[in-house]
Amino acid sequence: MNQSGDLKFNLHQLLKTMVEKGASDMHITTGAPPMLRIDGAMVPLKLPPLGPVETKALCFSALSEEQKAQFEKSNELDLSFGIKGLSRFRSNIFTQRGAVAGAFRTIPFRVSTFDELGVPAIVSDFSNKPNGLVLITGPTGSGKSTTLAALIDKINTEQRLHIITIEDPIEFLHPHKLSIVNQREIGSDTEGFKHALRYVLRQDPDVVLIGEMRDLETIEAALTISETGHLVFATLHTNGAISSINRIVDAFPPHHQSQVRTKLSLVLQGVVSQQLIPRMGAPGRVLGVETMIPNAAIRNLIREDKVHQIYSQMQVGQEKNGMQTLNQSLYSLYSRRLISLEEAMTRAIELDEFKMMVEGRTTMASHHSRPPMGR
């Protein structure tokens, strides 16, 4: 293990390799070679394990002097940066067992279209809403930022509005098109989400993107901004529409929750929940998507604290207004042989229901495959 920091490669070369291999993430840590995340799995580069001097040299090469000083104080730092002709990157530098480590994620310069992302067409319609709250949810690495970027780009391309994004850090860059887009980064442009949201209404926005609703104050601000005639996009680390609604309501003290349910029932325009799933028999991943678009019945269920009944509304809402449960999305991907049964069942929210869907398909397939009578 090289302890001298006399590297045979630099961070730029590693990031270039990361992009060329189609990795979503790269990890730099002591005792292991640089590791790439490809299609969700960790893959080591054919390089020797790194020592603490090397990991610090690699990670610090991405930082300004000001950022280095900030890191030395807190032992962790979020940042984003771009390399011309290659890609943008989001990074978190941190310490583990006394040594510097880093996680780097690719962010393409070009914003993908909805067709390229595999997002249902109904999701793009959220860009035309005049006001309200749209939630994009899912676990880390499920493509939430990419879907949000596509929505912002569609508004930016088609409408003459003022868009403000509040991000930690800024990921996709949005040039002014028909709209103007002001992108604010936590740390460099504003103290925090709470601070930025306190002043955002004075900045005359039409659309506000909140990178992540992390706490009560941020959630409360998102509801207020959407209630006052603005369109708000935000993310949550939840796995479905029902858990997203519960997360928002449960963030408030019990004596405020009835009022919050009423407010949410009025402003919520939709919930999109995403999961990236390994493609069967080929490299890459495909998107599983749950979409919930509140109708009168769903708004009433939110208001009356009967959120658990929303699932049945989503099950029957697929043909009427484009809603679908995650199970319906998984079943569609499985029936088209895009994902394996094992991967689908691992991610199914209502496993018994999903098994019945699969058994129904198997029964129909065996029925249709029977030879005609008399042969």
Where are the model-predicted features located?
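Short, flexible helix-loop junctions that flank or precede catalytic/ligand sites
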Residues: 1-375
